[in-house]
């Protein structure tokens, strides 16, 4: 009888401990903007950028992923690269 009581108490404690697991967190965000203008009879992209962020704890550690892209028809390649670097640092 004592073994049965100990087994019941142990089972209740195990069930109680395993039911208090932390919830899985997953958050995703996406943003996109574009501006175009007709210049010299041609439609030009002034800016086109997109940003994606995601946060999750699938591995037990909180992981943040950030991706950004930028493009423009009126800026020089060096200026475009500079803006891309600034977006990826955010």
From Swiss-Prot:
GO terms for biological process: mating behavior; sexual reproduction. Keywords: Behavior, Secreted, Signal. One of its GO terms (cellular component) is extracellular region. It comes from the Eukaryota. It is found in: Secreted, Extracellular space. Its main location: secreted. Residues 1-21 form the signal peptide. Main cells of the accessory glands of males. This protein is transferred from male to female during mating and may affect egglaying and behavior after mating. This is Accessory gland-specific peptide 26Ab. It comes from Drosophila simulans.
């Amino acid at each position: 009888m004592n073994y049965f009581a100990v087994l019941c108490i142990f089972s209740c404690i195990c069930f109680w401990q395993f039911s208090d697991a932390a919830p899985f967190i997953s958050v995703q965000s996406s943003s996109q903007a574009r501006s175009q203008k007709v210049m010299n009879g041609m439609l030009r992209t002034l800016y086109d950028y997109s940003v994606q962020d995601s946060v999750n704890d699938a591995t037990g550690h909180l992981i943040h992923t950030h991706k950004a892209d930028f493009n423009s028809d009126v800026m020089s390649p060096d200026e475009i690269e500079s803006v891309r670097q600034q977006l990826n640092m955010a």
